[in-house]
Amino acid sequence: MSAAGSPVIPDNEGGMQPPKKIVRGSHRVMAASGRVPNRLVFGRRMLSTSGGANESASVRFSPLLAPVVRAVRKYHPDEDIQVLQRAFEIANKYHEGQKRKSGDPYITHPVAVTAILAEMGATGPVLAAGLLHDTVEDTEYTMEELTEEFGEEVAYLVDGVTKLDKMTYGEHASIETIRKLVLSMSKDIRVLLIKLADRLHNARTWRFVAAGSAARKAEETLKIYAPLAHRLGLNTIKWELEDLSFAAMSPEIYAEIVRMVGERTPKLEKFLDESRSKITERLDSVGLEATVTGRPKHYYSIHQKMKTKGRSFDEINDILAVRIMVETDEQCYTVLGHILSLWPAMPGRFKDYIKNPKNNNYQSLHLTVYGPGNLPLEIQIRTYKMHEEAEYGVAAHWRYKAASRGEKITQQKHEPGAHTSAMNVGILQSIAEISNSNPESDKFYESLAETLDTDEIVVLTPDGEAIALPAGSTPVDFAYAIHSEVGDRTVGAKVNGRLVPLHTVLP
């Protein structure tokens, strides 16, 4: 679609308002070595060092890009986003004539993927890669052309996603091995985030795919991509992937749970409103500013609880949870005291994930009380920063960038730690180095660094069996790892579908 006839999108169009006052900050962003300069990121024809937000404000964008542009201007108003229209034009040109199973033009898929990334707070290179992620694999557009047009950084990200798409696992490969393989191929976490956004949009359109095919993809998603999203702290994406997978794999059970939750909704909403009112009234009376929201458990979560606890739907009492967000850690514990003065706590249901974070960096206070009517009420207490990290995990650093410049940000005020500030500048050259730079760094980042910085590679046989080898191994080493006789008889090798010399270092 030509940019010439497209409408101008106003600077301040759209954008969800935060549930409380707009929070501003003036936090310093720590620099890190290895950042690809802007002039190399997008190619010399695409980006100038002058202009910035004012220059991009006058650019005409395709209407399809409106959600992307709104999100970028919300989180990164100074970002030069002219490259997005050019990336869209290239993707639209090369995907022309291609259709989704839904019958929609194929271009709607990369645009939707990019919109998901933009709502995470992603910046230019990631967004351009989101728009272009299927061009090299599915069209005649070459990696050389992409590199020339958009620079090495965008090409690197697209190449990483393409390699993930080409992976075949084999029916005998263990789930943990596949997860490790996916992570090992995603040396830059941004590649994995693009892949997760890609899988999420595909999952949203499974209803247009044959039931059997959708169920197989859903099982793969539930076993591989949802846990990876959880490990990266991307709970918003994890929950949606789980619900969509559940709906595709067990449509009748899913529909029944949706129906039962719907029948309970009026009663649940009344209970929730009463609980929130009491909490808000108490906190207001002591001058403690907080945001109090309610959320239902996700359908898959309800199903899992019924399954693991051996309970019927009517025996699941904590379908709703109240979430309380405040500014500081100290205020979290102050709120806890007020909650316990309102209602008695249910024994054995208190968890302090602030002092003892989960492995994926999740932090909150969890407790269950006997709320109004003596009914169980699950309560979560966290800071705005903890909430952002709980929702967006490793992607939250993109939003920190906006906070660090004093731009408006949704729901939180941040004091970025060393690891999050370092991630602001882009490429994660060494997660281990980032972790070591901060003695307080969370266990999750150390664990992920071990996974991604490993000196071991995982190679799959044609039957899907996983073989762990030292980095630098060749096809001959792989053959002998299978069996000495296989190694003795090896005369050729094929890696990722291509014949290679026996001395080739395995990727």
Predicted regions and their residues:
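Ubiquitin-like/PB1-type beta-grasp interaction modules and other compact soluble beta-rich domains
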Residues: 435-507
